[in-house]
Amino acid sequence: VYMNKYKWYYVHNYNKVKGGIFVIEVKNVTKKYGNVVAVEDISFSIKDGEIVGLLGPNGAGKTTTMNILSGYIEQTSGEVTIEGYDNLKKSKKARKQIGYMPEGVPLYTDLTVKEFVTYMAELKQVDKKVRKERVENVIEKTGLTDVQNKLTRNLSRGYKQRVSMAGALVGDSKVLILDEPTVGLDPKQITEIRSLIKELGKTHTVILSSHILSEVSQICNKVIIINKGKIIAID
């Protein structure tokens, strides 16, 4: 569905969704840095349980879009709602719905896996009564049980990605946003992370960015193609 047909696509499909409600709605969003336009008038919607790929070359606007969704930055104009919460008017509640894994695996390397995930649970204000159980569940879900007592600095790149993903998940967010989750991994690690993302898609809405067509076609059931800050197609 190309951009000149997008308005029709959005209105037509909005009425098909139960209750007319999407988990994420982005309407005519633009982000400018001075005179530089990072994303321009983008619109899309994501339903509960979808695994959505944001596909485009480097500098296309993928990370900017994800940073807006996750609450790291604010859009210049347009509207974003997460689970019905406006990202500007009800930013705290909107951010609570999101688990974000930025590109680059930002970990505290002097902490063990379990210590890091526990620390992330504290930052995300997970109730103390359920924090220990939540941490254990997330560690198991991301396949980190056998390495939970190892320092994160001593892990392979693939396991570091898993730890970062566990940190994003531990807040019990409904939406998981993954920025270039397989970048820098070897073929075996890529296969493992892709399988993990598919498994997480059974219980979460997942949005991931990539510049690799084969990756999003294997993992995602919906693809948003973006280039030079504009959405080119939605499939």
Predicted features, each with a name:
Residues 24-26, 31-227, 233:
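ABC transporter nucleotide-binding domains
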